[in-house]
């Protein structure tokens, strides 16, 4: 896959959010009259597109009848040996930057604390957070 595209109400706030996850802006451009960029990190690439007159996104995580985009998933198997500790560190990082820049950052919204899940013959640690527009992001780490 080349990239996943995310529409955002505020591209500058979204860039700052994804930078805290380890992404960096690789290209900035416009699509028509809207601001856009590609960001690379966590072994993937995302595209952020600012929407001039945004409407609230559906609750893809909470509405079990919702059809469409559900979440992006990032494999942290190579990045950490302990997903709960990694997530706690991320929460602290967001808490600190929210103090310094309250207009740009909110405390990290955790949708699902780390839990173990068996999928096929593997056991994973899985956690979900929400991005700045409330879109669910999954972090997964293979344990075996």
PLM regions: where:
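Short, charged/polar, Gly/Pro-enriched secondary-structure boundary elements
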Residues: 44-47, 56-57, 134-135
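A short, acidic/glycine-rich surface segment
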Residues: 34, 53-60, 113
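Core segments of cupin and vicinal oxygen chelate
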Residues: 7-46, 52
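Acetyl-CoA-dependent GNAT
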Residues: 51-53, 142-143
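Residue-level marker of positions within ordered structural domains that often coincide
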Residues: 44, 77, 139
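Vicinal oxygen chelate
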Residues: 1-10, 28-30, 37-40, 59-144
